[in-house]
């Protein structure tokens, strides 16, 4: 069985992330969205909250699972029997970063990195940008994040203002 892991901090999951998940689910027999924690960024949602939100969004994709990922991606992949890492590329800067990480991952384990190009409408979306414009009161967040996440995002950002 071809199993892929799509790792990320997903704080929050964006429409760009969701597009990569959907496309990967058409390529691999099973896709596991690995919810990690980026220690260099202040998280808006806990890993458990992110897992719950993402699970709601992908519920109609039968070969997609969501799990909390601790430690190195390659360690998690070994635990779940995955051989492929899926990553999305928005631009050349992403490519440089992902190329370096792919090299490190393949040095650590027998894994392949599969890079999917972001569709033009998603090339400028990042979780950091979504949080920034959301904190400034943008009301059309559904352009950037799945509808099921918009309310949770607005609530959390409003709670931070208090």
From Swiss-Prot:
Where does the record place it? Cytoplasm
Q: Which residues bind substrate?
A: 9, 41, 73, 87
For this record, an example GO cellular component is: cytoplasm
Q: Per UniProt, what is one GO molecular function of this protein?
A: pantetheine-phosphate adenylyltransferase activity
Question: Which pathway is this protein assigned to?
Answer: Cofactor biosynthesis; coenzyme A biosynthesis; CoA from (R)-pantothenate: step 4/5
Source superkingdom? Bacteria
Q: Which CDD domains match?
A: PPAT
User: Which catalysed reactions does the entry list for this protein?
Assistant: (R)-4'-phosphopantetheine + ATP + H(+) = 3'-dephospho-CoA + diphosphate
Q: Name one GO biological process term.
A: coenzyme A biosynthetic process
Site-annotated residues for Transition state stabilizer: 17
Pfam families documented for this protein: CTP_transf_like (PF01467)
Q: Detail which positions bind ATP.
A: 9-10, 17, 88-90, 98, 122-128
Q: What is its main location?
A: cytoplasm
* Enzyme Commission number(s): 2.7.7.3
List cofactor names only. Answer: Mg(2+)
Q: Which InterPro entries match?
A: Cyt_trans-like, PPAT, Rossmann-like_a/b/a_fold
Which UniProt key words apply to this protein?
ATP-binding, Coenzyme A biosynthesis, Cytoplasm, Magnesium, Nucleotide-binding, Nucleotidyltransferase, Transferase
Q: Which family does it belong to?
A: Belongs to the bacterial CoaD family.
Assembly description: Homohexamer.
Briefly, what is this protein's role?
Answer: Reversibly transfers an adenylyl group from ATP to 4'-phosphopantetheine, yielding dephospho-CoA (dPCoA) and pyrophosphate.
UniProt-recorded name of the protein:
Phosphopantetheine adenylyltransferase
The gene behind this protein is: coaD
């Amino acid at each position: 069985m071809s199993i892929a892991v799509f790792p990320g901090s997903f704080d929050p999951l964006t429409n760009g992330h969701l597009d990569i998940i959907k496309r990967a689910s058409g390529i691999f027999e099973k896709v596991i969205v690995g919810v990690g924690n980026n220690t260099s960024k202040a998280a808006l949602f806990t890993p458990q909250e992110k897992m719950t939100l993402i699970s709601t969004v992908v519920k109609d994709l039968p070969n997609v699972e969501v799990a909390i990922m601790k430690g190195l991606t390659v360690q998690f992949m070994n635990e779940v029997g995955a051989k492929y890492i899926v990553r999305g590329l928005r631009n050349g800067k992403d490519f440089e970063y992902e190329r370096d990480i792919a090299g490190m991952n393949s040095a650590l384990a027998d894994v392949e990195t599969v890079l999917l190009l972001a569709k033009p409408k998603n090339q400028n979306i990042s979780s950091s940008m979504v949080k920034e414009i959301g904190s400034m009161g943008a009301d059309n967040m559904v352009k950037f994040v799945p509808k099921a996440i918009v309310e949770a995002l607005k609530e959390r950002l409003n709670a931070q203002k208090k």
